[in-house]
Amino acid sequence: MKASCQVYVKGSLEAAELYKNALNLTPDPEMTAFNDDGTYEHVSLMYGETEVVAVAEDALDLHDDIIAKNKRPVMSFNVSRLGTREAVDHAYAVLSKEARINDSPDGPASPFWDDNGVVYGFSLLDKFGVHWWICT
C-alpha cells in the first residue's frame, strides 16, 4: 500500500512554491495538471521518488470555513528525519512566515518528540491552513 495526501488551498501556485522551497521538493511533471485559470488542479511535490504532498486549488471555497469551525486541523503533515538542524531551521523560516498558529514561536527546539525519542523540530499551522510537524 502507498498512501499520499493532497491539500486544497486558495493560492495553490503560491502554496506549492512555499512547500517546494521549505522542504527542497520538486514537482512531478507527470502528475501536474492546471485548471483553466492557471491554478493547480493537482501537483505532486516530490522528494526524490517519494511524494511528500500534493497541492490543488480549493475551487469550492470550503477550506477556510472548515478551519474556522475547527480549532485545530484534523490532519497534520509529519515530516521526520529531515536530516540536519539547518534543514529544519530553513523549513521553519519559510513556513512560519504569516503562520496562522505557531506552536513553536521561538523557533525549532529540542526536546521535540517523535516515535524515536528526542529530536529537534517544530509545529505550526501555515498561512494556507496546513498543519506541519517537522523534525530532524
Feature names for model-found ranges:
Residues 1-10, 17-127, 134-136:
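Vicinal oxygen chelate
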